[in-house]
UniProtKB/Swiss-Prot annotation:
The keyword Hydrolase does not apply. One of its GO terms (cellular component) is chloroplast. It is found in: Plastid, Chloroplast. GO terms for biological process: mRNA processing; RNA splicing; tRNA processing. Usually encoded in the trnK tRNA gene intron. Probably assists in splicing its own and other chloroplast group II introns. It holds the Pfam family MatK_N. Keywords: Chloroplast, mRNA processing, Plastid, RNA-binding, tRNA processing. InterPro entries: Domain_X, Maturase_MatK, Maturase_MatK_N. This is Maturase K. GO terms for molecular function: RNA binding.
Length: 504
């Protein structure tokens, strides 16, 4: 039982006190301001708050909190404070931004301790999100079933606070967090109205959500690590199975040094778990019956241990050879490539049918066209239309915007097995650009192209920086044969790219 506690305690013995006084330090808000200026995190920050940041406002906020004069004012009060001359909601934004930096300090201290060689808890084989790409290339085609899991949100905000108190012992900080959450968010749901959540730092919400996810993932990983020892057995062979596991333990102890690479035969349960944003997948070589058991493990764990309402319909079982998995912006499946081999032996000949499993990643063209249609680049059928809101810009600015979006989409979907759908997206953006320019100059598309030619659209097809690097690495013959373009290329930064993030 002591061994199991290592998995379930989440290293909670390592708690840190006295985080609350940091809310009165000016450098905390300076760090929060630096987070806001980080362009890579632009989708996590409130730009209105960043633009209004100043050291004078920080000093006034600290004085106000130190005097305990109404730490937080209701979000419905949008009037300006006559004494300070600023919107009261601005102070709430700054407090939540500063608190988002403070609660991350215990985790930063753990990283410092690890770099100094101190002992840390087991990582349970947790890996970076970038390990998804080698998993798809090396392991995905060997699996049979996958659980497509839609992670439920906590139905009560107190669950988020309870998850954080295992890491932070400072009661004052937790009281401040609880008060802020209950003051500005809907008490019935984690999904709050935009008016309420806009004055609360999104970075803090993501941190609380990830802390809560880490809580139930630790229990799931414990079950995963023990799954290889929980095989169903009949009572008739139960004693033989005990001796069998005893032999396995003996083999693991004797051959650990000499045959370490072969230990996967005994230890690897062939279960892979990946979480990305609000979704997760559980892939395995098990049968559909065992995957159905894992499905109800998830539902029961969420409902009875974490008090989150979840239905079995939120967890779907897909057979990879028949269905595609919508994950990371791709439709991934396992395709069978049939091959016929003729074998000649003396006077007899044999024909052998082989089916090789191969990973197939396709672009969800329907949903992508829907996104382009919503952004007013085409209609619902995929026919390009002009972008009237951009017609007031200069020609070079219009072309740069379209080229940027086209390259971002090409960069993101470079891991696709088939590039035909990507060429269609490029076609839509190309002619949407032409129609926008023709609209600006009050001319038809045909007359506009006839007058200027298509040379000015060469930027859509010019060699990108990544392709230029590949042309230097790979031989020119291999590069010009276009095999490189047909192959999958995974770029590690696509996990934080919104496909149309730069179209506004």
């Amino acid at each position: 039982m002591e061994e199991f506690q290592v998995y379930l305690e989440l290293n909670r013995s390592r708690r840190h006190d006295f985080l609350y006084p940091l809310i009165f330090r000016e450098y905390i808000y300076a760090l929060a301001h630096d987070h806001g200026l980080n362009k890579s995190m632009i989708f996590l920050e409130n730009q209105g708050y960043v633009n209004k940041f100043s050291s004078l406002i920080v000093k006034r906020l600290i004085i106000r909190m130190d005097q305990q004069n109404h730490l937080i004012i209701s979000a419905n009060d949008s009037n300006q404070n006559p004494f300070f001359g600023h919107n009261n909601n601005l102070y709430s934004q700054m407090i939540s931004a500063g608190f988002a930096v403070i609660v991350e300090i215990p985790f930063s201290l753990r990283l410092v301790s690890y770099s100094q060689g101190e002992e840390v808890a087991k990582s349970h084989n947790l890996q970076s999100i970038h390990s998804i790409f080698p998993f798809l290339e090396d392991k995905f085609s060997h699996l049979n079933y996958v659980l497509d899991v839609l992670i439920p949100h906590p139905i009560h905000l107190e669950i988020l606070v309870q998850a954080l108190r295992y890491w932070v012992k400072d009661a004052s900080s937790l009281h401040l967090l609880r008060f802020s959450l209950y003051e500005y968010c809907n008490l019935k749901s984690f999904i709050t109205p935009k008016k309420s959540i806009s004055i609360f730092n999104p970075r803090l919400f993501f941190f609380l959500y990830n802390s809560h996810a880490c809580e139930y993932e630790s229990i799931f990983l414990f079950l995963r690590n023990q799954s290889s020892h929980l095989r169903s057995t009949s009572s008739g062979v139960f004693l033989e199975r005990i001796y069998f596991y005893g032999k396995i333990e003996y083999l693991l102890e004797v051959f650990y040094n000499d045959f370490q690479n072969n230990l996967w035969l005994f230890k690897d349960p062939f279960i892979h778990f990946i979480r990305y944003q609000g979704k997760a997948i559980l892939a395995s070589k098990d049968t559909s019956l065992l995957m159905n058991k894992w499905k109800y493990y998830f539902v029961d764990l969420w409902q009875y241990h974490f008090y989150m309402w979840s239905q079995s319909g939120r967890v779907r079982i897909n057979q990879l050879s028949k269905y595609s998995l919508d994950f990371l912006g791709y439709l991934s499946s396992v395709r069978l490539n049939p091959s016929v081999v003729r074998s000649q032996m003396l006077e007899n000949s044999f024909i052998i049918d082989n089916a090789m499993k191969k990973l197939d990643t396709r672009i969800p063209i329907i949903s992508l066209i829907g996104s382009l249609s919503k952004a007013k680049f085409c209609n619902t059928l995929g026919h390009p239309i002009s972008k009237p809101t951009w017609a007031d810009s200069s020609d070079s600015d219009i072309i740069d915007r379209f080229v940027r979006i086209c390259r971002n989409l090409s960069h993101y979907h470079s891991g696709s097995s088939k590039k035909k759908s990507l060429y269609r997206i490029k076609y839509i953006l190309r002619f949407s650009c032409v129609k926008t320019l023709a609209r600006k100059h009050k001319n038809t598309v045909r007359a506009f192209l006839k007058r200027l030619g298509s040379e000015f659209l060469e930027e859509f097809f010019t060699e990108t920086e990544e392709e230029h690097v590949f042309s230097l690495i790979f031989p020119r013959v291999f590069f010009t044969s276009r095999k490189l373009y047909r192959g999958r290329i995974w770029y590690l930064d696509i996990i934080c790219i919104n496909a149309l993030v730069n179209h506004e």
